[in-house]
Curated annotation (Swiss-Prot):
Superkingdom of source: Bacteria
The species this protein was found in: Pseudoalteromonas translucida (strain TAC 125)
Keywords from the UniProt entry: DNA damage, DNA repair
Taxonomic lineage of the native organism: Bacteria, Pseudomonadati, Pseudomonadota, Gammaproteobacteria, Alteromonadales
Name under which the protein is recorded: DNA mismatch repair protein MutL
Single Gene Ontology BP annotation: mismatch repair
Length: 618
C-alpha cells in the first residue's frame, strides 16, 4: 500500500477528533477566540443543544478581508510568530487548528469586520480540498461564526452525541467557567431563542463577588473565604468554602485559562486532608497567576491540563496558601471544655491573631474588604443571624410590650427597634441618663487612676482609698454602652466558618433565640441538621467553637430572659486568656478612660490597707 498525502478535508476531520468532542468543545474554541480578539460582549446562541446551530457573536477586533481565507486554513494563527512565542503563551488559543477542524465536520460560515474596513466579509469552506469562498455581507464591527449541523458528514460521530438537554448542560457549565475567568466581559447564552444566562460585565473589581454569586450560588458568595497569597511571578487568589459545605463548584484557572489539572487538584485536596482530614473537597474558585514562561500549556489536546516547569514548587505553594488560611483557625481553637478554659491562665506572649490573616494584602484581585467578608443576608435554606428580624419567621423571639418602653429606649438611644425590644423585658439600667453627667464629674474628682497589672487585674483609688479588682466586673456595663452606641456587640469573623452538627430540635431552639445572639456578636447560619458559625463575640473568639455552641444551647434551654442575663452569661464564659489578648487591651484602654468604670469595679473590689503594708517596711 503506497503512502499518500491525505485530502485536506480528511486531514481536518482527523484533527477534529481531538479538537471537537461535542458541541461544548466548539463553543469553547470559538468563545476563547472571541476573548483573544479583545471582545467585551459575547452572544452565544444555541439551538437543539448545539446539534442544529451554534452561533457566536462578539464585538472584538475582527478579521481583515485578506486574512479570512487563512482563518479557515490549518496551522494558521495570529497568536504565534516564532518558537519563542510558543514558550511564552499569553493567549487562550494558539494552534491554528480549531476553525479548520470545526469547518470540516459542520457547515461553518465566518462573518467579520474590522473597525478600519468600510464593509464586512463572509467566508466559508467547502469541497474536497476545503477551498475558502469569500463574499461581502452586512455586519457590524466584530465577528460572527455560525456552526450548523455539527457532524453532518460523520454519522458515526453524530450517533454518539447525547440528548439535547445533556449537550446543552455541558455548554451551560462551560459558560459558567468562562464567566468566572473574565469578569470584564458581558456574556449572554440563549437556547432555542430563550435567554438562559446573562452575565453583565463587572468592570469594578469590587463587583466580582456579585458574578461569583450568580455563577456559584448565593451561599458560596456568603460563606466563601477569600484567599490571596504570593507575589511576583507566582500568585494565588480566589474563594474556598468551609469543609462539609454542599457545593460542587470546583473551578481552577491558570493565567485565566480554565483548568482541570491533576497537580492543582492534588495540592488542594492534600491541604484540606492535612488540616481537617476531609476526604471530600469543598467548593472553591481558585486563580493561579504564573509567569507564562514557567508553564507549558501545549500538553493536552483540549488544553485542560498544563505542565509546570517547577511542579513541586507550584504544588507546595498552593498547599501552603490554603493551609495558611485554615491552620491558624485550628491553632486558635483548643479542644478543652468551655468551663475549663475559663479557669485556664494564658501566657502574656500568646495573643489573639487577627482573623483576616495575611492573605488580604497585596495587589492581586484587590477587592474591598466589605465585598469579601461573609454578608448578613439570608442564605439558601438557612437563616443568617443578623438578617432576620426579631419578629420574623423561623421561631424568632417576639418581645412583649412593656410599660417602661419609653424610658428604656431613651437610654438605649442608638439601639434599633429590633434590639430595643429585648431591653423592654426589664433590663435594669444601673445609672440613668439624667444622672450620667453628674456621676462622671463626681467620680472624676475623687479618682486618681486605674492601674492595670496583669490579665485583667487592676488597682484603682477612689475617695482616698486603694482597691484591687478585675476588669471583668465592668464588662457587662461596658457592653451595655457598646450596644447603646452600635446596636449590638461587634463579632469577630472566623478565618473559616465552622460547622457544628446538631439535632433538628436543637437547631430550632437556637433559631428561636437568634436575635439575642445578634446582640452578643454571634453570626450563625442555621440549617435543619447543623449550625454554621461565621462570627463569635470577640471575648469568646479563643474558645473551641463546638463547645461554645453547646454551651450556648444550654443557655437557650434555661432560657435567659433579658439582656443583662445574656451579657452576664457571656462574661462568665469569657476565658481567662482573653484578658491577655490584643482585643481586650483595646477595650481596656477605653474602660480606663471612662470615669464610670470606677463605680462598676467597686461592686467587686477588695480594699487595700496601705498602712498595714507600710508597717511591713519598718
Amino acid at each position: 500500500m503506497s503512502i499518500e498525502i491525505l485530502p485536506a478535508r480528511l486531514a481536518n476531520q482527523i484533527a477534529a477528533g481531538e479538537v471537537v468532542e461535542r458541541p461544548a468543545s466548539v463553543v469553547k474554541e470559538l468563545v476563547e477566540n472571541s476573548l483573544d480578539a479583545g471582545a467585551t460582549r459575547i452572544q452565544i446562541d444555541i439551538e437543539r443543544g448545539g446539534h442544529k446551530l451554534i452561533r457566536i457573536r462578539d464585538n472584538g477586533a475582527g478579521i481583515a478581508q485578506d486574512e479570512l481565507t487563512l482563518a479557515l486554513s490549518r496551522h494558521a494563527t495570529s497568536k504565534l510568530k516564532s518558537l519563542d512565542d510558543l514558550e511564552n503563551i499569553c493567549s487562550l488559543g494558539f494552534r491554528g487548528e480549531a476553525l479548520a477542524s470545526i469547518s470540516s465536520v459542520s457547515r461553518l460560515t465566518l462573518s467579520s469586520k474590522t473597525k478600519h474596513q468600510e464593509a464586512a466579509w463572509q467566508a466559508f469552506a467547502q469541497g474536497r480540498d476545503m477551498a475558502v469562498q469569500v463574499k461581502p455581507v452586512a455586519h457590524p464591527d466584530g465577528t460572527t461564526i455560525e456552526v450548523k449541523d455539527l457532524f453532518f458528514n460523520t454519522p458515526a460521530r453524530r450517533k454518539f452525541l447525547r440528548t439535547e438537554k445533556t449537550e446543552f448542560s455541558h455548554i451551560d457549565e462551560l459558560i459558567k467557567r468562562i464567566a468566572l475567568s473574565r469578569f470584564d466581559v458581558s456574556i449572554t447564552l440563549t437556547h432555542n431563542e430563550k435567554v438562559v444566562r446573562q452575565y453583565r460585565a463587572k468592570t469594578d473589581p469590587s463587583q466580582a463577588i456579585a458574578r461569583v454569586a450568580q455563577v456559584a450560588g448565593k451561599a458560596f458568595a456568603e460563606q466563601g473565604l477569600h484567599i490571596q497569597s504570593g507575589e511576583g511571578g507566582l500568585q494565588l487568589h480566589g474563594w474556598v468554602l468551609p469543609v462539609g459545605s454542599a457545593n460542587t463548584v470546583q473551578y481552577t484557572y491558570v493565567n485565566n485559562r480554565m483548568m482541570r489539572d491533576k497537580l492543582i487538584l492534588h495540592a488542594i485536596r492534600q491541604a484540606f486532608e492535612e488540616v481537617s482530614g476531609a476526604q471530600e473537597l469543598p467548593g472553591f474558585v481558585i486563580y493561579i497567576d504564573i509567569d507564562p514562561r514557567q508553564v507549558d500549556v501545549n500538553v493536552h489536546p483540549a488544553k485542560h491540563e498544563v505542565r509546570f516547569h517547577q511542579g513541586r514548587l507550584v504544588h507546595d505553594f498552593i498547599l501552603q496558601a490554603i493551609k495558611q488560611v485554615v491552620v491558624p483557625l485550628q491553632g486558635e481553637f483548643t479542644n478543652e471544655p468551655l468551663n475549663n478554659l475559663a479557669d485556664t491562665a494564658f501566657s502574656q506572649t500568646d495573643t489573639a491573631r487577627s482573623p483576616t490573616g495575611n492573605f488580604e494584602s497585596g495587589e492581586v484581585f484587590d477587592y474591598p474588604k466589605s465585598q469579601l467578608q461573609p454578608s448578613h443576608s439570608v442564605s439558601s435554606g438557612g437563616a443568617s443571624l443578623g438578617s432576620r428580624s426579631a419578629g420574623g419567621s423561623g421561631g424568632a423571639y417576639r418581645a412583649t410590650p412593656s410599660t417602661n418602653h419609653h424610658d428604656i429606649n431613651a437610654f438605649y438611644q442608638g439601639v434599633s427597634e429590633q434590639h430595643a425590644a429585648h431591653f423592654d423585658q426589664g433590663a435594669h439600667v444601673s445609672v440613668g441618663v439624667n444622672q450620667s453627667h453628674a456621676v462622671e464629674q463626681a467620680v472624676a474628682l475623687k479618682t486618681v487612676a486605674i492601674i492595670s497589672i496583669n490579665e485583667g487585674v487592676c488597682v484603682f483609688s477612689s475617695e482616698q482609698q486603694l482597691y484591687c479588682s478585675h476588669f471583668k466586673y465592668a464588662l457587662v456595663d461596658d457592653w451595655h454602652e457598646q450596644i447603646k452606641e452600635q446596636g449590638s456587640l461587634e463579632g469577630k469573623a472566623l478565618l473559616l466558618p465552622v460547622r457544628v452538627n446538631l439535632s433538628k430540635q436543637d437547631c430550632e431552639l437556637i433559631a428561636a433565640q437568634q436575635s439575642w445572639f445578634t446582640l452578643l456578636g454571634f453570626e450563625l447560619i442555621i440549617e435543619k441538621q447543623f449550625v454554621m458559625v461565621k462570627k463569635l463575640p470577640a471575648c469568646l473568639y479563643l474558645l473551641d467553637v463546638t463547645s461554645a455552641v453547646e454551651s450556648l444551647l444550654e443557655a437557650c434551654k434555661a432560657p435567659l430572659e433579658n439582656i443583662e442575663s445574656w451579657l452576664a452569661w457571656q462574661m462568665q464564659h469569657t476565658p481567662a486568656r482573653f484578658y491577655s489578648s490584643n482585643i481586650f487591651l483595646a477595650q481596656q484602654a477605653r474602660m480606663q478612660n471612662n470615669p464610670q468604670t470606677i463605680e462598676r469595679l467597686r461592686v467587686k473590689a477588695v480594699k487595700i490597707d496601705i498602712e498595714h503594708y507600710l508597717m511591713q517596711l519598718d
